[in-house]
UniProtKB/Swiss-Prot annotation:
This is Uncharacterized protein YhcO. Gene3D superfamilies: Barstar-like (3.30.370.10). Pfam families: Barstar. The gene is yhcO. It comes from the Bacteria. Belongs to the barstar family. InterPro entries: Barstar, Barstar-like_sf.
Amino acid sequence: MNIYTFDFDEIESQEDFYRDFSQTFGLAKDKVRDLDSLWDVLMNDVLPLPLEIEFVHLGEKTRRRFGALILLFDEAEEELEGHLRFNVRH
């Protein structure tokens, strides 16, 4: 299982995350532009599953700012039943 790490010391906004996510997985720039399109990418066999995604350097303030993104990945992990692992580390 490949691990993909997103460092929130370098990601300041959701738009930054969408850009980094798209670059990491070789997606077109406009493929991931909001939470709905990110969900579609996760659910529609676009990514090389199985995989693990981890968010690092997420302090409390940053967790609150990116709460919707974290919840989306938590739900995706449940939906994909073992094909996606998601972790958050400080």
